[in-house]
Amino acid sequence: MLEIASKLCEDEKYTQALKYYENILRIESDNVTAIIDYGVTLQNLGRYRQALEMYDRALTIKSKNLGALINKGSVLHTLQKYSEAISCYNIVLSLDKQNTMAIAYKGLSVGEMGNIPSAIKYFKKALSIDNEYELAQISLDTAKRIMKSH
């Protein structure tokens, strides 16, 4: 069932996928992968508060789950709770210093808080680990343009 739900998400059939995740969680209420994927699906539908609840639920079961922490940070960022998002990314980075997604996402949140020079450092750091990380490159280019325009 998890594979079917994932495939539906790939096809952007999020509402249908939710039903599969709900069925999975009825059977295996502590399936962390299903909980996180359910949260991501809710997030894709713009149901951020519910997504946040799912990530918190996953973290209650497995407190150091990097996927749940990064996704929680992403939702908090979307909700403009940048400091809280950064806290999530900091936990990830305390567990995995080379996590390029957490580094780049932290840069995005730092940038939204107005510290563009610091954001640039995070994007460069992510690119030093993975020089093909598109999000970091696009974010770096955008941040540099912002710096030039001010």
PLM region descriptions:
Residues 1-33, 37-44:
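Alpha-helical segment of the N-proximal tetratricopeptide repeat
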Residues 9, 36, 43, 70, ...:
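Position-specific recognition of the canonical hydrophobic site in helix A of tetratricopeptide repeat
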Residues 32-33, 66-67, 100-101, 134-135:
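Helix-start (N-cap) detector for alpha-helical repeat units in TPR-like alpha-solenoids
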